[in-house]
A protein has these predicted regions:
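Bacterial N-terminal signal peptides that target proteins for export
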Residues: 1-10
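Asp-based phosphoryl-transfer active-site loop
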Residues: 66-80, 271
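Short, solvent-exposed loop/turn and secondary-structure capping segments
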Residues: 79-82, 87-90, 199-200, 273
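A metal-dependent, Asp-based hydrolase signature
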Residues: 82, 87-166, 170
């Protein structure tokens, strides 16, 4: 039996654990979306869910077909001032630099080490791919998972001074929980690296790793010291963005979604694919309009560019969420 003092230490440890970890929202029966103002988007979500879950309704969708897909960057968590995975890659360059003296004179690594983000951006997609390959490959999948978890445990958003996993959108956490409570299976379909996201999605969003779809690099089965491991190779396998998203949905989920949520041009095809379903379909864009509580951006930004979606949404019956107007709070720590 534990001594009384030991029991209190254990209880305190548990309390502290749950105090620092973002809680997965549980839907309130009276109002499952309490952080949403009572405006058009909230009503549209509630009306759609009611119609597709009511047996006998012409829009009824069987539980097996209730698939909802969510982008991650800018839809579930903050993507400014840069994608979180890019911040991870930049930190990895600095950590690995002593083992790579050639990086001091090789772009885009030189710009990273010099703190020249404009130089990094100028390297374009080719340079960013080199950064990813140089910092994400050459290790086993298990080693990479540990690296990601260790980084997320200490890295903070530069503006909010909170762990990145706390810079998640409270209204979207409520939405995820609400849909699951109504028989939906929730998936993340993101341009981010699938093995970067899987270490935290279950804890933060309630989405298990097998329901996370993302961009991938190639892996290879090898024996290391007589034990089988999967090695991450410095080669791109698939980019899960734009037209690649419906392809990945078909390939890895195997069902056409009923609901799709995004925030950028990279999500357009996913919403288009979802809302031309045989079932009634629902598409929603999160529009970043709140510079005070978060960030305001759309057509002119490097991260989360949104133009065609804004123009096409009214014509296609897609919902556009104005963050400033529609959300009572943005982050859990702002409640």
């Amino acid at each position: 039996m534990l001594a009384r003092g030991c029991r209190w230490v254990l209880i305190l440890a548990v309390v502290l654990l749950f105090a620092v970890a973002p809680a997965i929202s549980q839907p309130d029966k009276a109002d499952p979306l309490p952080s949403w103002n009572d405006t058009t988007p909230k009503k549209a979500i509630n009306d759609f869910v009611a119609k597709v879950t009511k047996e006998g309704s012409p829009d009824f969708v069987p539980v097996a077909d209730r698939v909802a897909v969510f982008d991650n960057d800018g839809t579930l968590w903050c993507e400014h001032p840069m994608y979180v995975q890019l911040a991870f890659a930049l930190d990895r360059v600095k950590a690995l630099a002593p083992k790579h003296p050639e990086w001091r004179t090789t772009e885009p690594f030189k710009s990273v080490l010099d703190g020249n983000l404009k130089g990094v951006a100028a390297s374009g997609e080719k340079g960013l791919a080199e950064l990813i390959m140089g910092t994400h490959a050459g290790m086993t999948v298990d080693e990479f998972e540990v690296t990601v978890k260790d980084w997320l445990a200490t890295a903070e958003h530069p503006r909010f001074r909170r762990p990145y996993t706390e810079c998640v959108y409270q209204p979207m956490l409520e939405l995820l929980a609400y849909l699951r409570a109504n028989g939906f299976k929730t998936f993340i379909v993101s341009g981010g690296g699938v093995e970067f996201m899987r270490p935290f999605t279950a804890r933060v969003y309630g989405v298990p790793p097998e329901q996370v779809v993302g961009s991938t690099i190639k892996t290879k089965y090898v024996l290391r010291d007589g034990k089988p491991v999967l090695m991450r190779l410095p080669e791109i396998d698939f980019i899960d963005d734009k037209a690649g998203k419906p392809v990945c949905i078909h390939k890895f989920i195997g069902r056409r979604p009923v609901m799709a949520f995004g925030n950028s041009a990279g999500d357009f095809e996913m919403l288009e694919y979802t809302t031309t379903n045989n079932h009634r379909g629902f598409g929603l864009f999160v529009h970043h309009t709140d510079a005070e509580r978060e960030y305001a951006y759309d057509r002119k930004t490097e991260f989360g560019h949104l133009d065609k979606g804004l123009d096409e949404a009214p014509k296609r019956g897609w919902v556009v969420v104005d963050m400033k107007k529609e959300w009572k709070v943005i982050y859990p720590f702002q409640k």
